[in-house]
Structures are given as structure tokens and as C-alpha cells.
Amino acid sequence: MLTCEPNQVFVRFTKKTMDSYYYEESFEVYSGSQLLMTSPSFAKGELRDVEFCLPESTNRQYSIHLLDSGRDSWQSGSWVKIAGIYGNIVFRNFMTQPNEEIYPFSLYYAVMKEQQWKLTSYSSTIPSEWTSFGFDDSAWQDATLGSFTTQISGTQYFRKTFTSLANMAAYELQMNYRYGIVAYVNGVEVFRDHMPAGVPTPTTLSEGSFPSSSYYGIIRPSTETLPSSANILAVELHFPVIGTSFIDFDAFMAVLAPSIPDDPCFIYGDEVDVSSNVGSNVNSIFDFAKINYYTVPVGRFPGQVTYAFTGSRPYVNGIRIWPYTGYASSPGAFVWEGHNDVTSSEWNEIISASSITYTSSTYKTFFSYLSSDLYKAYRFQILSGAATQYARAYEVQPLVCSLAVPTGIEFESASYSFYVEYEDIVIRPKVVEFTNCSVTPSLPAGLSLNPVTCIISGQGEAASSGTYEVTAVIHDTAYHGSFSLHVVECEGTLVSVVRSYRSDAYKESFAIQDAVNVGFADTRRLGALEELVEVSDIATP
């Protein structure tokens, strides 16, 4: 590993290139508007590590610019990964835009290895508030972890204050342990391992162990920490027997910036082992390659893909789906679920979505606000294709997101307009967890509300305009939201365009204009491969 000066920050970039146009691919690193480094030239089919010492920046915040000199984006299968001084992944992504994409990344550690903590041990009882920030630990001893060699008797308790940052997506906490452990952030339990259920006491013994002490971790939403303020990390270590033990605990906490645009979400960057019950090319479902895909054949639904995470265990509360140009064959309905008991067939639903529509080469993101948890394994069930009898999943990325609990129902649009009889109406809330849904006043004739999903669908039978309020429930809490709907008569000529094609339809388009090339003009991009597609009914003047 490269050794950096005290005023420098270590970083490792891993760049993957393919066999074509690798010489067009590069990246730059900035601190604000200041260019700090430019990547070296990369070779054909290369997986290359580049270590660098960056100058210190405010809170060690930087940005990476993904560049393609050919202005046709990186080749499918090319990606870049960024790791910090402890080898933890702080960014991983691939390029979809033609010539440039910009992402923030953070090399800030709220807690670093070998720092000073507060330490004590108990053999009988401990104050219940010991995990809270306001607890008085002045009587606890100071211990610099990693070099503290004294033995202590009983269950070991640790406390460490730290400062988090604003506008982050997640944090990664890795801890060095062998036996039982329970960790808390600001008084809330965030992790336990090798421990029975229930509130632990100093006499609670661990259950199970690793062969030796090593670092194991979690990635959780940054909403669990207070930005730019004091926080407390509290950890208790339990052992198979009550006795005297050495102190071999240590930990670090990395604060992670968003790795997708528009939403405060972090893409899981470590390797993932995937397996499926049916279909082909399952490894393509999450391989940072934009044109590879996993297929669920006709008549073989549901396609079940299990994600087994090899690095820190993520608290997945978001899913991002890349449809490439196959928007008609991308998953039209799915369930994302998790479980902690590998011997059980029971899975807990986290996110479910149906009647999904896509735009060609545009990500679609789904969130879970109240049904997420820290699971050992996750499963993605594809229930149907969006508009085909089979399904293709090009890239399904698990996300850890900083999400605020919703205060109301927000729809994909505040206002909708559709033509009478000729357009299929689909109106859905952005949050997919709402249920027990009702609407007032009554919907126009031809439309109905699904009370389980809050999705409104159908075809308007007559012209009407109005504002509608939907009431729904999440975990016994009522939420409300409204939208305006205009169902209008077509005053001109209705044109239905049907077009067939074999491949690369996303490169083609058409326009409809009046005779003097003014007024109406509508250009539609088509994206599904090898399918007959009815574009839409188009009203013209």
C-alpha cells in the first residue's frame, strides 16, 4: 500500500476495461473545482489498481468525473471502484451517458482504527441508558484500541463519540470481534451477531463464534446518525463463558456519499454471489455491465434470484433497475425480500411493485420506507415482464438510501391528462408500501383504485376534470395525498402507429407534423428488441 503524508488521503481506484475502445475511457478526481488527478491510460481487457495520495479536502469530500473521449460512453462491462485506506468500498459504478458523468465520493471516517475509546466491564448489571449519548462515562477508563493489552473480567463495554456529515447516503461500520457482539448508534441497536434474541445483560453468553477475530461489517442509512453533530457508538462484547479476556476489539466507520444521481443512495460495491431457480445468465443481473441480462423464459415465472453479499451486510431499502433498451421486457412486477434464517423458506417482503413501465436506457428506482431491515440474504422475485411473456433483467442494483419517513402520499405527477377511451390510465404513488387505500370523490367511469397498492388504472369513458384525494395506511398510520386528473375528448384525428423492428430500435425515431411543418410534432423513441410494439394513440390537430 502506498504511504501518504499526514496532510494527504490514501485512495485506491480499480478500473475495469473491455477489449474495445478502452483507450477512450478515463476519469478525473476533483476537490470542488480543483483538478487533483487524472487517471493513467488503460490497456485492453484490464483490471487495474491505481493508488494515489490526494490532498486533504474539507471533510475529505471529492468528486470523480467519468470521461469517454469518443463521446459514446464506456463499453459495457467497464466500471470503476474506489476504496479507502481500510480497503472498504466507497464508490462503484459504470457509465451510461455519452461523454461525462460526475459523482461525489467520501473518504471521511467518523471513527478510525486504533483510536481512543471509553471502556469498562460488568459481571452483573449495567445501567440501561449506557448506549445513549447523554450517559456519564467519566468513570470508564480510556483505552486506545489496537494497542490495549490488559485483560479484564466480564462482559466488555465500549463507547465512542463521533461526528457524521450532512447529505450522505449511508455509513459502513466494521468491527473486529470473534464471539458475541451488539452495537448501537445513538441508543438504537444496529447490529448483533452470535447472540440470542432479547435484551442482553452482562451475564448473557455468546452463541457461536468465528475461528478467530476479524473485521465484519454492516452498511446502514445515514439517517441513523446526526449530521455535523455529536453521536455515540456503543458496543458490547460477550463471551462463551464469564471470565477474563484480552481486549482485541477495534472498529472503523466510513461515511458514504450517494453514488447515484437525484437520490441519496449508495450502490453496494463489494462482490455479490447470485443464484436463481430458473433462467439463464443470472450473474448478469448485477455485474456493472449495461447490456448483459438475466432471462426468465416464457412460462417459467417467478424467476427468483438470491443475492448473497460477500462484504459488509447491507440494509437494503432501495432497488435500482437499468432497462437498457429492452424496456418492454424488463421486470413488470417484482418482489424484493429478505431473511436471516438460511434454513427457513420464509421471506419478508421489503419492496413490491407491479404495472411497471420504463423509459429506454433510463434507470427506475424503488424504495422501502418502513419495511426494511438488516438481512443476511435477499431475494429478487420477477413475476412478469413489463410487456412481454418473458423478462430480462439487465441490472438490478441493491441500494442503501438515506430516506425520510413519508409525511403524505406523493404521486409520480401532481397532474394527469388522458384522452377519453383511447389511453390506458395508470396513476401510482411514489412510495409502494401504502395499502388499505381509498379515494374521494369517486373516480370517473372506467377507472378503479386497487385498494392494496393504491394504483389507479383503466380508461376514461367520458370527459371530466377533478382533484382526488387518496387515503392509505402504512403500519397503522394514515397518510393522505391528492392529484388532479383531466380526461379530455380528442378534438382532432386519432392516429394509432404500429411499427415492427428487429434490433437497435433505440437508435431510430419518427415524427408526425402538419403539412406546413408547424404545430404538432411528436418524436417517440422505441426501445424493446425483437418485439412488435404499438407505440400509442396519438391525437393530432
Predicted stretch roles:
Residues 445-461:
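Strand-loop-strand motifs at the edges of beta-sheets in extracellular beta-sandwich domains
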Residues 2, 6-8, 91-147, 172, ...:
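Accessory carbohydrate-binding/adhesion or oligomerization-edge regions at the termini
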Residues 15-18, 65-72, 235-243, 380-388, ...:
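Short beta-strand-plus-loop segments that form exposed binding edges in beta-rich domains
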Residues 257-262, 280-349, 362-404:
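Aromatic, loop-rich ligand-recognition surfaces of beta-strand-rich domains
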Residues 406-437:
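Solvent-exposed, low-complexity, repeat-rich "mucin-like" stalks and linkers
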Residues 73-81, 242-251, 387-401, 508:
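Edge beta-strands of jelly-roll/beta-sandwich modules across compartments, strongly enriched
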Residues 12, 64-65, 140, 162, ...:
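Aromatic-lined ligand-binding clefts that engage carbohydrates, nucleic acids, or primary amines
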Residues 478-488:
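C-terminal edge beta-strand
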